[in-house]
Amino acid sequence: AKITFTNNHPRTIWP
């Protein structure tokens, strides 16, 4: 899993 921040909003991306 990878956590990225978009507009200061944490989002978890599952490949």
UniProtKB/Swiss-Prot annotation:
Disulfide bonds: none annotated. Keywords: Antimicrobial, Fungicide, Secreted. One of its GO terms (cellular component) is extracellular region. It is found in: Secreted. It comes from the Eukaryota. One of its GO terms (biological process) is killing of cells of another organism. Has antifungal activity against B.cinerea, F.oxysporum, M.arachidicola and P.piricola. Inhibits HIV-1 reverse transcriptase. Belongs to the thaumatin family. This is Thaumatin-like protein. The lineage of its organism: Eukaryota, Viridiplantae, Streptophyta, Embryophyta, Tracheophyta.
